[in-house]
Amino acid sequence: MHNKILVSSYILLVLLFSLSSFNIVVAKDGDESGNPFTPKGYVIRYWNKHVSNDLPKPWFLLNKASPLNAAQYATYTKLVADQNALSTHLQSFCSSANLMCAPDLLPSLEKHTGDIHFTTYGNKNFTNYGTNEPGIGVNTFKNYSEDASVNSFRRYGRGSPRDNKFDNYAPDGNVIDQSFNSYSTNTPGGSGQFTNYAPNTNVPDLRFTAYSDQGTGGEQEFKTYLEQGNSGGQSFKSYGKNGNGADSKFTSYGNETNVAASTFKNYGQNANGENQNFTSYSTNGNNPQNNFKNYGVGGNGPSETFTNYRDESNVGDDKFSNYVKDANAGEANFTNYGQSFNEGTDVFITYGKGGNDPHINFKTYGVNNTFKDYVKDTATFSNYHNKTSQDLASLSEVNGGKKVNNRWIEPGKFFREKMLKSGTIMPMPDIKDKMPKRSFLPRAIAAKLPFSTSKIDELKKIFHAANDSQVAKMIGDALSECERAPSPGETKQCVNSAEDMIDFATSVLGRNVVVRTTENTNGSKGNIMIGSIKGINGGKVTKSVSCHQTLYPSLLYYCHSVPKVRVYEADILDPNSKAKINHGVAICHVDTSSWGPRHGAFIALGSGPGKIEVCHWIFENDMTWATAD
């Protein structure tokens, strides 16, 4: 009996020792908690299996794996098999998986009397709020929607004469979605004021539908609206339509924005005696896009004024379709219009046609304008800048190999290879990642979700994305870019899991690979000094795979092969103290022959396609792959 107990104890000790050893091995191949059944644990094992070298693991990549724990991973893998089931658990899924999803806003039917002040609010739906509210007063929104994504104002202030003020609304937001539907409709008087609305935002989507429709008197003012915004768009549909004696003012609207789009549809249509003023609109912007359709059509005595419109911008396009058509009297004035540094395009189609004695004046306006079907007898054109081809070349092209008009290219964004020498002092651009923080989906979940433009309706249903929402636009844009045919000589793929990225990189470069990124953002937007520097693969011309983030609910990268490059690693020093502040990765494109002649690199550096190499830093959270040394 005693011997049996000893044998049993020995077996138990062996089993315990074996399990302990097993746990130690698993911890090496699992996530930081040592659990091999998490998505991150699987990605680490996948890296070990598919990458042939024993170099240190790229934790900046592996840490982008899904943060789901083992139980959550099992639950959502089961739910994704039934997309309706996943959709019903969307908010918990997005939160657990670190995705970017719009919140589901519940309608607000609350009533109030007196003046109401909203301070530091966000993610709220105002439906029927302030409807038919009597009396004179004001409702204010101050510091509203800071760092928030979605707000909806539906039938807000309908039939009420009260004033509404939005002060410092949605500042510094990322992928914000703000909608105003039937706002201040049928109002007798009252005013709306948007001051410092959505400044410094990244990819905003701002929508005003039937705003101030059938209003009487009152004034709607947008001051410092979307200033210094990046990309995104604004749409005004049926704004001020059927109004009576109302005024609208846009001052410093969209100034210093980057590739922002504005659409005005049925703006001021059939209005009586309305005044519309655009002052300093899209000034100093980079490639602003503005579209006015059915603007002021059928109005009675309208007054439309554009002053310093798209002044000093870089290219950009404006289109006016059916502008002030069938209007009775009234006037439209364009002063200092379209004086962009680099030539843009302005198209006027059916301008003032069918109107009764309209007065249309263009004073000091830019080149490359097209006027079709306008009232010649009542349109006045003065001081038209019809620049010669030589003048245009001095503005938008390279003249004599010198750098010209690089105000829209951030200092240090592009540079020559000779700058990558120890001791060089040079500017570094803003390399900070502007995208919202997200994680990869586990491959097992990503593979079961639709991912094509043909199934976009299914995706919108899963992610609760309304047809006109920013999330729906974001999904559509990403899928279209992913399905775009590759450029000549390019191999490309969109990857929404870490495993897919590993597969693509190794398919192009082989299994002996290294992935690199710039260590941090120190030195960004200032001068830096180059410290020690190393050329990857001996500094020889090589091939790499570059991966750049794309805006999507989950982390999504656009990866493509980049032939004929040289890749460098460099210590980045503070130019004053000489202390190391960063470790940067730079890539130099040796062959630029397929680049366009108006590429920002040539505007900043001079020369043209195929004549020079062009270098740039790898920005935060972007990465480049190369074969290991």
Swiss-Prot record:
It is found in: Secreted, Extracellular space, Apoplast; Secreted, Cell wall. Residues 414-628 form the BURP domain. Glycans are attached at residues 125, 143, 255, 277, 333, 368, 386. Residues 267-293 have a biased composition (Polar residues). Residues 1-27 form the signal peptide. Coiled coil: none annotated. Residues 267-305 are annotated as: Disordered. SMART domains: BURP (SM01045). Keywords: Apoplast, Cell wall, Cell wall biogenesis/degradation, Glycoprotein, Secreted, Signal. GO terms for cellular component: apoplast. One of its GO terms (biological process) is cell wall organization. Residues 28-109 form a propeptide. Interacts with polygalacturonase to form heterodimers. Non-catalytic subunit of polygalacturonase. This is Polygalacturonase non-catalytic subunit AroGP2.
